[in-house]
Amino acid sequence: MNEFLPDSCLLGVMLAVSSHSGPQVIYHYPPSNRILETARDAHMNQQLGTTGLKRETEGRSMKSRGHPGNWDMNSELDSDLHSSKMERTASSSSSSSLSSPSSGLSDSELSTDYADWSTSGSSSDSELDLQTPDDSRRSQLENAGARSTRNVSPVSMSRNTSLGREPKDNGQKISASKLLDILNDPKSQFTKINTNDTNDDQFNMEEDDDLIEFDYMTSEKRVDITEEFFTEANYQDTSKFFEFDIDFLAELCCPSREMCNTRFELTVDEYCFLGHPIHVDSSGNWRKSRKRNNSLSKSKRSGSLTGSRKRSGSKSSNHDKSFSAETPNSPESSKIIEEVGSLHKSRTLSNPQNDHFTKDMTMFHVCFIMDPNLIEYNKRVDDMYQYVVARLSVLLRYLQSKNDYVSEQCELILKEKEKVFKNSKHYKSLSLPSEKGRYLYQRLLAKSSLARALTECVEKIKKNEIACLEITDHRTVSLQIPIQNEFSILPQYKLYPVLKGSFLTSIQNNKFLEKSANIDDNHHAKSARDTNLISDHVNTFSNGQTKNEIFYSKNMENALTAQNDYDDDDLLLYSILLLDDPDKIIADLDNYSSNDDIGGVILKQLVKVIQPNVPLLSYQYIINELLAEKPLSSSTTANKSKQNKDNKTNTFYSALLRSCALHLIYWRHARAILPISFKNTYIVSPLSPVEADNSEMIKGNRKPSITDLNVTSNSSSKIPVIYLNQQSFKLKFPSLPSLPTFLNILSLGKPKAFGNIIPSKEHKPIYMAALIWLIQKGYLTQLLTFVYIRVDKKIKMKVDEDLEKEGFRTNRRRRQEDNVDNKLLSTDENANEPPKSTKVDINDNTLEGRDTEYDSDSFDYDDPEFNHDYTIILEPERATALEKRWIYKCIQDQPQDIKILFNKVMKYMNGRTAMETVMLKEHISRHDIKRLLTSLGNYIVELNHW
């Protein structure tokens, strides 16, 4: 059982939609044959002898559930069948490539638009060198459209193609509408040569345009696919997805409305289909708007931002207008643009039914395919749904309700498929199915932002990395499955493997992220009053804030509320420990934020100056300097309005610092720890990577992936990590003892403060750097102090005596009152009775009443706890009346300053809150805490734990 090891068990993703014409699969990834992949993966695992992980082939191979030995015959048989299939496909493709000299079309191209698109032809992927068009044609088109290609976003550029359906046959085909355009050309009635030249120019123009755009997207690194999926051995026909027909999966993953808008989980054989299908309601809305007026106003504002992209959509022929606006006004370029625009216009008008695709779509479903082990099934599937599936589906539903994003992207993908299958000469020139498939997927990824997002999501999550998906130009979402690399309780790592180098500490970083997520759900109304302040600052300081998800106004509202509701454990009281070099972290921040983003600027500056021995709250001056504002005024002479403004600004700066820290923690760049000090006590962690090798080690404790966990065949991978780190430690700190010796010094004798091993003051800087390095690598963990209140039998007896004294005085008053009442209410029937017996009855009734009163006050002397020699108070803040008397009796004879200090700290003496944390929360010095614990003496129980 490997629950603690990072393994998403993710295989692929599929986008299925349902419209009036029925369900269909729009996009799926990867197009790979899983049997061949798992056979190679099993062989690799058998060769390397790995037991902890099943996914150790550079993060791209998929694990096998069967025995490695059973795959040899099946994989060989499947390889033979696949190779024979490719030979038949290649021969048919080569035979169909002969075109007629009269019309430029082969017999197989004379087809109709009503071909079955649901079962696609075999298009494969392998290593492919893209063939560029002639230099003359390329230079001619670059003069006309290179500038437009650079400036127009890939989504807006790709919405001008026509919707098409994937043909069933493998041969080259051309749609009937395109054939009619050629035959109806007036020039074709007079001269056959002019007709061929004109149409060839149009097709070449379109092909050049697509290739230039594709080259641009490749240079911008927006097209990134795994080459292993597109080899001849691993490639699988696009009509199948993990051994299932596409039509079958379309019916399977498009449930009825009653089963939509909730969790979708279906197991077929060893595969688990997990998703969250989104269906329109009875009124045709994708989601219910809580505030219709606000949503309408927001939609108007968003319409102004996305209007240019929508106006350049596929429903009109405005592509040539926007294209020509960015190009020089030369006759040659204008002629080329007119030809391209007319071709796009004719293709768009030839398929009028495509314009209704957006209105016809009633459901979409992003379905992920997994293969978890049976013993880990619940955990793997639940984590995948909670952290990836649900969040991505909700975001796509929001975008679909706002601007029909999903339906437009689906239409765009279908159009691009038809364009590649019917019009791409480069696609037809390829012989192998794997090469065709690779080219097809590259074109789809270059055109569709949704296809890129789904592909990147699969690639990153499979490698246990963070997937930063740029859905649109204004929407970015980060998805990840958190790795288990921190523990508050020592796990049974011999039975259940864990990542070596994990952190063993009570300071759990996940709780800060969970609190931020809980604020999203529970405190929208409470933070609404600060929305105007936040929006004003964001609009003033940042124009590119959408490039970084942590600086959305929504998250800033949440950060403002965190200090009010979680003041007992504020993130600003902790320090930030960077887990990698600052230069690498800044380089990563540059990839996901723009230069003018105020959030990115603050983050970069914070990474440069941050130190793990300084609380995060001390870095507020960075924001003041970057925003060029004067220090906040706190003078008593300032008026009330100015003080309120300063308080709001200070709250905003604190929220911004908190957001920066959460960003670094979420992206695994840093950890929140207690400020490092020489007065703290540090011990060697039981989870330190002393006996681990490279396969069990988190490299730098940063962004672990399957690549990091991979075991190579080199002998160096089996060397314990401590010997590898010993060299780095020696190079970094040459004047210190070796790493094993240094750890041995910390392990000898009783744990003591780290400053006791420093020989002199001159050695403090280098010892501080060594301490930070050891904590980064997971070798050391801080030993914390936890306290319980202990009440012994003497305190209980004193409290018992006090209660008896108070109870005696109460009985005396009640006895007198009862005597008076009984004398007034005496009857003739009781007049003959002696007074003595009357007193006895009164006393008995009084005692019963006293017992009843004390029972109501929870003073139960028959409680077994009362008779024990001592009692530990687990919750001092919620102690009973009797327990409170015990507690205050313990400090009755203490000085007044000790009593005041005890009242501050008493609620934290529950055995769960470290005294080192109390020092930060209550601003109490270490000396005062030590004096308090010494004064209480035997009345406390002190525990040392991580």
From Swiss-Prot:
Compositional bias per record (Polar residues), positions renumbered to this chain: 146-163, 324-333
The biased composition feature labelled Basic residues covers 287-301
Family, according to the entry, reads as follows:
Belongs to the NPR3 family.
Which PANTHER family does the record cross-reference, listed alphabetically?
CGTHBA PROTEIN -14 GENE PROTEIN, GATOR COMPLEX PROTEIN NPRL3
Q: Name one Pfam family in it.
A: HTH_NPRL3
The UniProt entry's GO CC annotations, sorted and at most eight, read: GATOR1 complex
Region feature (Disordered): 48-171, 283-334, 813-849
Where does the record place Low complexity bias?
91-125
- The name on file for this protein is Nitrogen permease regulator 3
Point out the signal peptide segment.
Answer: 1-21
Keyword S-adenosyl-L-methionine, does the record have it? no
Please give the InterPro entries that the UniProt record associates with this protein.
Answer: HTH_NPRL3, Npr3
Which residues fall in a compositionally biased region of kind Basic and acidic residues?
79-88, 836-849
Entry's Gene Ontology BP terms: cellular response to amino acid starvation; cellular response to nitrogen starvation; meiotic cell cycle; negative regulation of small GTPase mediated signal transduction; negative regulation of TORC1 signaling; positive regulation of autophagy; pseudohyphal growth; regulation of autophagosome assembly
Relate the protein's function as given in its record.
Answer: Mediates inactivation of the TORC1 complex in response to amino acid starvation. Required for meiotic nuclear division.
**Transmembrane region positions?**
none
Its keywords, alphabetically, are:
Meiosis, Signal
Q: Which organism is it from?
A: Candida glabrata (strain ATCC 2001 / BCRC 20586 / JCM 3761 / NBRC 0622 / NRRL Y-65 / CBS 138)
